[in-house]
Amino acid sequence: MPRPRLVLLDFDGVLASYSHAVRFSHLARSSGCAPERVRRALMDDGLEARYDAGLLSTGEYLHQLGDAIGAGIDAASWCAARRASTHVDPDTEACVSALAGRVAVGILSNNGLLMCEVIRALVPSWFPRLDGAMLLSGALGARKPEPAAFQRALAHFGASAGNTLFVDDSATHVAAAAGLGLDARQAEEPAALQRILSDAGLA
């Protein structure tokens, strides 16, 4: 495999640690309901998946979430809960900053559009270098492991599968990307990223 010209990185699980439970609890406190009610509204009823797939606008998503938990949720409250439940290690932050100085880097994440604001707030040092490089499923209109998610990401960067390294914590996503010809590697924790980049000749 040649040295990659593009590196596509998952966010949650690869670049950041993320706790659903912390997020649900944070939203529950701000809305005055139980965390389990938030979890059911987002996960059991498919609301989160529809937003992540681009089937709902941010306004529609927040309105439906508010209806489901019996309290209004605005974008600021949603982003605050997501930030509180997500952590980017300083070593990972520095690793991506250095990597982006050597090769094209994109973030390919199954998230809705509000996540753009969250990532910018969590790791401002990545910007403006990564402006235009955050490819969220809500904007792409496809979620990993759907082939369209990878194909649209490659088209966005004008890259070929054979020159692209893809790193994700999901074995299913890695297998789907590999099936399309990407050099796909699984990182089950953020600390694994540096090793993978070294193996690919990028560190």
What are the roles of these predicted feature ranges?
Residues D12, S17, G106-N110, D168:
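Short beta-strand segments
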Residues E48-C79:
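A metal-dependent, Asp-based hydrolase signature
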Residues V22, H26, G46, E60, ...:
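Alpha-helical elements of Rossmann-like donor-binding domains used by nucleotide-donor carbohydrate transfer enzymes
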Residues D67, A76-G106, P147, P190:
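Short, acidic loop-to-helix structural element flanking the phosphoryl-transfer center
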Residues L27, E36-A41, G46-R50, D74-P90:
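Helical cap/lid subdomains and adjacent loops of hydrolase enzymes that gate the active-site channel
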Residues M1-M43, A68:
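Active-site neighborhood of HAD-like aspartate-dependent phosphohydrolases
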Residues M1-R5, L9, G112-L113, E117-A203:
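Asp-based, Mg2+/Mn2+-dependent phosphohydrolase catalytic module
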